[in-house]
Structure formats: structure tokens, C-alpha cells
Amino acid sequence: MGYKNSDNTNNKFSRKSMSPSLTGGKGRKTVGKKVKKTIPRKTVNWSSYDVNSDSNEDSDEESENENDSDNDDEDDDETEHHHLDGLYSLMGKRPHDSSSNGDDDDDDDDDNDNKNIFSSTSSDGDSDEAMFSSSDDDSDVDFVKLQAQQKAHALKIAKARKGLKSKPKNESNDNAIASSSESESNSESDNEDDDDDVVSLKKLKPRKKSFLKYGRRRSDAVLPDINFKFEFDTGENDELEAGNQETHIKEPEEEDIGEEVDYSPENPVDSNNVPSLEFEFDHHLIEVPKINEEELNSDEDYEIDDNELLATLQAENDAEEFLPPITKGNSQPQRNDSLISSTIEEEENDNDNEEASKGGDGDDDDDDDDDENDPFLKEEEKYLVNEFETNGFDENEEDEDEDDLHTFDSDFSTTNRIVNSFKGIGEDRSKPIVKYESSVSGGSDYDEDDYIDLINFDVPLFDDKNGHLDGGKKNSHHKGNTDKLKKDKVKQRANSNHNSDEDDDSYLWNYFFSSDNDSSSEETDDKNNSKTVNKSRKNKKNKKALTNNAITGADELFEQIENDNTFKSKSKSNHHGNSLYKAYSDSPMTIQDLEAEIRAGADDDDDDDDDYDSSESTDVDESLPKSSSNNSLVGSSKKATEVLSSKTADYRPPKLGSWVTVDCKPFGVIDGLSTRTLQLNKSQEPRSAAQSGTSHSTSIVNSSNGSGLGLPTTSIASSLAANPRKSIVVGPTNVPSSMISSDDSALGLDELLNVSELDNDDENDVKIWRDFNNNQNKKKIPLGAFRNKSVLYNNHIYQDDQHHHLHRRNSNADKKFNGSGHIKKQQPIRRQSQSKIERRRASIVEAVSQGYRPTKSGLFSETALADVEELLGDDRDLMELIQGL
């Protein structure tokens, strides 16, 4: 807008009305300063702000204001009014009420001019109340001056705000006022009072000053800066507006909210609403079906129909087989031909059943819950019955017809090609390695040789060249079987297609039946194995398909397995090196031939079967001659052998501590059960040679004070006199070293393990043991005979030991007291024994006088014993027992 220098008076109100548009709807307030009404030093060119007005009238009026320099105040006010409305509509906001701004100027202006100016400013001031916190930028605001203005004009603003109570509706409707048109702003300005006109007139002058003061610096600023001024000038009147808003905020809430929002947190909850909510709480719960007790207790759910059970199980098992897998594109799923034919039949049956079920749904709505009306079970039943009646598990003809109808586009994928290549291995050696089982016609568009590269087999077994390597013998045998294989393959391929890819693991048979593929010398066996695999694979597929040829196929399978085992046994005999395998597999041999073979292969056995042990028997066959290697190792045989003595009648239990080494027995005990052969020459034993120079104390193994169990001294002396080469292993300490033969070297471990059977001269033990082994007299000899003997023997050793220790104590006591006071321990023992005997005799005399008979078992009454003798007088054995007591 352009202004002339001579027209200060006419342009005064135009500048006042324009200033809110540049200062954000509020004039900048200064304290104690008045700006002279001079010519603005810089004009505002609105073309540089790139303002897009709502209508073309704003641009026309801007051009009129630039070119028009007349003194018509009304025209200037109207054009600026339209211009301000256009700016505010672009910003989406309204400036705050001009009456909220305090003023320091008391300029005298005409009332007509005030009314005209108020029309443009009162509409702007009415909507300025909605300018709360719409911007976040405070970089262009001088807060120090704002606080000074707020403190100085707080009282005047409070008086000037008395007219705002009549218009609370304008504050609540921010969006409506922000988008209001020019006519609405004019209608609002007409409703204002005369007092508001005076107040609005006073507010225009500080806008002019602030425009002159601050507008020079920001004349080139874009519209977003103006938005920031709109925002932060609202903070001046926060304190005053807070009290006014509290008074009239509830009025629009009562009108707007009213009946719709009764449960708002501002309104207290009525006591009548609480029981209503509790009453309706049960209705909002999830509806749980109520089941009668009769239905729970009934046994109908547990009654299972066999036909329905079979149909359900068949449906569950065949769900994955009959349903085609999800494939990408238009390619059909890779399935066997029988499966695809069955799925086509099933889909046809499903469509028929669905149409029938749709037609009958209207009549059978009440019976849908019953198992009889289950459409899925009906479909399965119908399908199974039709299949059993028509096909009877035999789908050979249908599968052969359908092989030409179905093509497998998905077979070109890498995984499927590899899997199918495994299936074709070894079926027919005259054809390529990879061939799809479902394509009987053989008319495939792809090159089958490409699949050979995918499978890295090191075996030259399946090449066609191998058929010409071994001469006419192999070729004639091969030709005889290829014709048979071709016939079987055509018949059995359709049945094998019934199995899914997951169940068909027949390609793994090649690994189990061709274990000797690495050696090139066994190609004959490999070919036989491959033929066996071909037949066994087909027989296995026949079993799975449950065809009529299953029984004959099983017989062929077992026959081929037996033939294959014979081939394997021969192949093992070639590279094992042991003639035993060949001997048992080829032909029966005589014992002489077998011995000759064993002698010839003794060296090979040492190399190959050195660590071999059958672990099935502990006996050695003595009919076979011993090898030279075994003859050199007599005492270190690796096999444990058990040798039993023939003298079972004279066997006696060995006594502990009486083990004596002997030279007459070549066997020693290892663990009480098994025995091993000892060396005949003791000088070869390294232990005995190393210990030959040791003293005789090593011959006494257990000689601590003679406390261990050992032979009596008499038996030891007699045994040493009888056999001077015997050495005592366990014995008392008083055996002199001269009794041990000096020519006998130290005992070896083998000698300590020898068992002495009949060396003991105690004839009593021999007699007792023989009587014990005798079945006739076994009952009469109790086991206490051995126990009593051992007790008496141990008693004798214990008494000797006590006497020995007593003698040592007495000798020590003599040395200690030097003969002054001799302590005799035997006298009180004799006195105690004499006193016991005397008391016993006195008690016996007293018992006899009272009528009792003393026996070994105690005192018995004479009358009782007399009654027993009268009653049992005829039984002599019992009487002897009683009298012996």
C-alpha cells in the first residue's frame, strides 16, 4: 500500500486498521513512549508475500488501495477490512479482541471515524480469544516488554473487558469463527455497544505505534512469522482471561454436552446409575452355553459306530494325500497318477454331495448336529464304498489310461527332478538313469541327461558301458533279465504310483544293497545287487499298494535276498583273506581239508585276526593241532579255559591261610571259576628270576604274630618233611627259617595261586568231607562239625596268643620293679576258677536235695524226667539223646 506524505490525517485510521494484520492482530504495546503520527518510512508491498486469497475480490481491492489516494475514509476502511478477512482466512485464525489490548494514547477522533474503524476491528477482536497455543516458536517475541505492558495495564484492561461476558459463544466456536466470512464479521460488529466502540478506538493507536516501531524490521517476513505473533500475544491476558473463562466455560458445555454425555467425569455420578450398571453387568458377559446334566451323564457320546470311525480315520489319514498342495502359477501339483485320478473322482463326488447337501439343508436344519448328517463323513463314505465296489484296490487299467492324460509341469523344478531321479536309478540298465515313473509313454520334452549332473554318484554301476565290460557271460545273463524287468515294470509302475513321495523310500535300497561298489573287481555282484534292488523295489511297492501280485512278489523278494546274501558271502571271501569264509560258503569240507586250510592260513590269521575272539566258549578244541605261535606262549594264553578235575569225590573246601604252592599241578586259580595254563619252566618267569636273591622273609606272606589262620605246627612239620620243596605261604611266627628249603627261590605270583587239594595230612578233614559228599550219610553229618572244628582251632591259637602276651607283660613288670614287688596275674584267675567250681558243686548238691537232676542243658525235675522216660521209653534214639543231656 502506498501513502502520500501530505495526507497524515486521512491515512491515520487506515494505518491503524492495517496494523493488526502486520503485528499479528495485536499491537505491540510500549510503556511511556508515544510514536509521532508521521509518514511510514517503509511501505508494505503485499505482492512479495505470495498471498493466495480466497477470492479474486481481495486482489482487486489491494490494487484499488495502492492506486487510490483520496480522502475517503469509508473506502479505505472497507478495503482494509476485506484485506484483513482474506489474511485471517488464509491463516485459519482470528486475531484477539482489540479491546483486550491496553492503550496509553488519548487521541481525539471523530465518532464517525470510530464507528467505521470499529467495524473492521471489532470483528477481528471477537475472534482473538481463540488464539491459544497454536504455535511453538517464540523467537520473535520480546517477553520483557510484554510483562511490562501486562503489569501497567492490568487494571484498565479489567475495566475494558466488561463487555465480553455477553459473547461466550464466540470463544467456544473457534473453527466456525476462523472460517467466517465478511458478512458474519459485520453482523457481529453491529451488535456491539457504544462503550465497546470507545474501547476499540483506544486500542487502535498502540497498534499503529507498534507497526511503526516493529514493522520496519519485519516488513520482509513471510506469513508464518505473522502466525507466531498471533500466538504469543495471547499470553498477555492469560491472568485476566482465566477468571473470565472459568465463569462462562460451563455454559457451552451445558448446551453442547447436555444429554449425550451424562457420564462425564465433571458431573458427579448419580446414585441411581450405580445399581443400574450393576444390574446390566450380567447381560454384558459372554454368553456361555448351558449344558444339561442329562446330556453330560448320557452315554451316547461314547457309543462309537464302527463305520463312522473307519470313515473318519480314513479321512484324516488321506487328508494330505487327496488334497492337492498349494502351487504357484498354473502348474499342477506333483502327484502320482493314481492320486490325481482319485482326487478328480473325489472332487466330482464332493460337488455332487455339496449340491445334495445344499438342497437338503432346508429340511434337515434340526439334525445338522448329528453325526449321521455330517456332510464330510457322507462324502468319505460314499467315496470309499464306490472305490471298493468298482475298483477293489486294483487301479492298473485306470492308471495306465490316465498316464497319457496328465502332465506334470512342476517336475521341472530342481528338487522334484532330483527326487524323481532317485526313483529311476537301477530300474532298467538299458535306459537312461533318470526316468519318471508316471510317464509310461516316454514322450518327455526335456533332456534326461541333464539330471545326471545333479547327482554326484561315484559309482559307474548304472552306466551303459558297464554292460560290455565283462564279456558275453554277463551280457547274456543281463539280457535274460531285461525282458522280464520290462514286463514287470509296465505292470507294476501304476501300482507303485499309488504311493506318495513321502512314503516312497525305495530309492534308499541302492545304498543298502550295493555296499561293495568301490572295488572294480566285483562288478558281477554289483549287477546282481542292482537287479535284486529292482525286483525288491517293485515288490515293496506291490506290498504297499495291496495288489493281487503281492504274495508272489514277496516270494520273489525273499528268494532274491537269499541269492544276494550268497553273492555277498562270496565277495567277502575274495577280500577278507581268510579261508574259513570261503570254506563255509562254497562247499562242505572234511576235517582234514579244514585242518589243512587252517595250517595254510595261520600266517594270515596272525595278521588279520590277531585281535579276533569269538567270546562264545571258554573251551579249546583239542582235536585241532596247535599253531606254532600258541606253542611258544604256554603261560600267557589269551583265551581263558576251564579245566575241571576228575577227582570230585575227594574234593575238599580249601582252608583260608593254607594255600601252598605245588609243582605237580599245572593249573592255577584266577578268580575262583576259571583257570589258566602255567609255564612249565619256572626259570622263564621274570618275577621269579628277579626275586631269586631276596631273603626268606618274602616266603612268609602273612606272619603277623601268628594271628592269621594257618596250619598247626605239627601238620606244617610233617608236610615239610614229606615234600621239602614246599614253601609255607601262611603260618605262625615260630616256624624256624631252617625248615624252609634253601634251594627254593622266592615265590612267584603263579605259585601263590596254586591250589593244594590233597596235601593236608589231616585225615579227619578228609573223612568228614567224604562223608559229606556221600548222599547216604549226608543227613547225619551236620554242618556244625566244620564250624566247631574251626572254633576249637581258633581257640587254641587265641590261648597261645594270650599266654605269649601274658609272659611278655610279666617280664616287663619284673624289669620295672627290679624284683622288689612281683605281680602275679595267674593266682587271682585260679582263685576265681576255684570259687566258681565250689559254688557250682554247692548248687548241684542243693538242687539234688530239692529233687532236681543236673544235666548239660540245666536242671530238670526228677518227676518230669521220669514221666518222659515212661512215655518215650520205646524210642531208643530219643532216650539216648535225653540220657546224653
Swiss-Prot record:
Residues 173-184, 626-638 have a biased composition (Low complexity). Residues 26-40, 153-167, 534-544 have a biased composition (Basic residues). GO terms for cellular component: nucleus. One of its GO terms (biological process) is regulation of transcription by RNA polymerase II. Keywords: Nucleus, Transcription, Transcription regulation. Transmembrane segments: none annotated. The keyword DNA damage does not apply. Pfam families: CRF1. Its main location: nucleus. It is found in: Nucleus. Residues 55-78, 102-112, 125-138, 185-198, 252-263, 294-308, 344-354, 362-374, 392-404, 603-622 have a biased composition (Acidic residues). The keyword Membrane does not apply. It comes from the Eukaryota. Induction: Induced during biofilm formation. Residues 1-22, 115-124, 328-343, 689-708 have a biased composition (Polar residues). InterPro entries: TF_CRF1/IFH1. Signal peptide: none annotated. GO terms for molecular function: transcription cis-regulatory region binding; transcription coregulator activity. Residues 1-138, 150-201, 234-275, 291-410, 465-639, 680-708, 813-835 are annotated as: Disordered. Interacts with FLH1 and TBF1. Belongs to the IFH1 family. Transcriptional coactivator that together with FHL1 regulates the expression of rRNA and ribosomal protein genes. The FHL1-IFH1 complex is targeted to the ribosomal protein genes by the DNA-binding factor TBF1. This is Transcriptional regulator IFH1. It comes from Candida albicans (strain SC5314 / ATCC MYA-2876).
